[in-house]
Each structure stands twice: as structure tokens, then as C-alpha cells.
Amino acid sequence: MKSLTLVLPLVAMSVLLSSCDNGGESTGGEPQTEPVKGAQSVSEVIFGQTPDGADAKIFTLTNANGMEAKITEYGAILVSLTTPDKNGNLADVTHGYDTLEGWLTNTSYFGATVGRFGNRIADGKFTLDGKEYTLATNNDPGGIPCHLHGGIKGFDKVLWKGESFEGEGARGVNLTYVSPDGEEGYPGTLTTVVTYTLTDKNELVWEARATSDAPTVLNIVHHSYWNLSGDATTSINDHELTLYAEHYLPTDAGLIPTGQVAPVA
């Protein structure tokens, strides 16, 4: 049996999240409250039902500083992230919905775990070990068809199995999904575990591990939308983002990387 293991840590977001400075309402429209010190906890309730009638849980992680992350089993989605700014005011800094129904029809991948393959595959085709595989073409930027974010029913549209955990200075949830051989056209049975961990240092860490029983292609990504002001009605045009990169990948008219590695300046 052949296996493949992938680990994708998401850089801790404490530096970015501490910069939100809006004292108004959160993106979910909830009034702001002062952080409750020392009230760290993990809880779970039913968030809603999938189209086939299965229950989807939502897990609420709260740290010692009042920071709170909500994650649902549907799509391994980050539903909300409420964090204190430098003045201690709480705000939800990610976009999402108050109920599961919003995600059942959403096509923007708010907060989702995207896979098996995040981003685009030209013409919905790839060749592996001499064999060509054909995938659904569910996107067409510039009128050029491609396979996007795992296909018609990617990781963002399936029900994962969640299990919470607690440790010293942290608490989190492991979400597991087994994608059968041939699902959305991909080879190999793939077992994926996504972990969200909220620490008492105001870090939210996202990590994905995947094991396949056959050679396959894989690119699992997290797809949250951020507005560090905590006000979803405002633009992010005044946000500043620094990337420590010397090169980037240019894309063609269909938003497919050309293969060129270009300098940033």
C-alpha cells in the first residue's frame, strides 16, 4: 500500500488579529462585550442539517482572554472568529453566516476547508503516473473552463466528523473526512484530518494532515475572508498586508499559473 502524508500549518494569526480597532458591531451583528478572563471552554451543539438530513455540529472554542472561534463539521468551516483588539474590544473579524443554511447555498467558500485540490486545474485534466484524469469543470474565468477548489462537491460541501480536545493553554477540534477513491474524479482513498487550535496567546492555528492509499494530487487550503476592522460593511482598502516573498506566480487569462516564477520587483 502506498501512502502520502501532508502537513499544512497555517501561520498563527495573533499579530494580524490584534490590529482590529473597531468598537462597533461584529460581522455577525452581535453587540461588543468585554473579554471574560479565565473563561476558557469547549462546547458543541447542533448547528443545522445537511441536505440529506444529517446533523452538523458547531464547536465553540473560548480562550482565557475571551477570544472565541466557532467551527462547524459542515465543510470544516470557520464560522466566526471573535477576538479582542489592542483596547480589549471584541469583534468578529471573519465573514460568515449565523445559520448553516447560508453555507448550503454559498459559492464563495467563506471560512471553508477547500480540497481535494484548492485553486484551479486547467481544463479539468491532469496526468499522474502516465494516466490522464478528467475532473468537473465548475469554473470559467475569462470564459476558459477549469476545475476549481475540488469540484462540484468538494471538501467545503461534505460533512466532517468533529471531536474536541483540551490541553494546557489551548483547546481545539479535530475534523476527519474520508474521501473515497474516485470522488470528484480523484484517485485514491484519502483520509484527511483538519485541526483548529485556539491558544491562550490569542493564536488560531489551522492544520491539515492527509493520507492516501494510492498516488494522488493534493492541495488542501483554508478559505476565510478577513476584515480586521470587525465591521463587515466597511472596505479593507486601508488594510496593510506584508508578505515576505521575493517571487510570485503569474497567471494566464484563465487564472492558471503559467509556470513562470517572476520577481516581485
PLM regions and their residue ranges:
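Positively charged n-region of N-terminal signal peptides that target proteins for export
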Residues: M1-L6
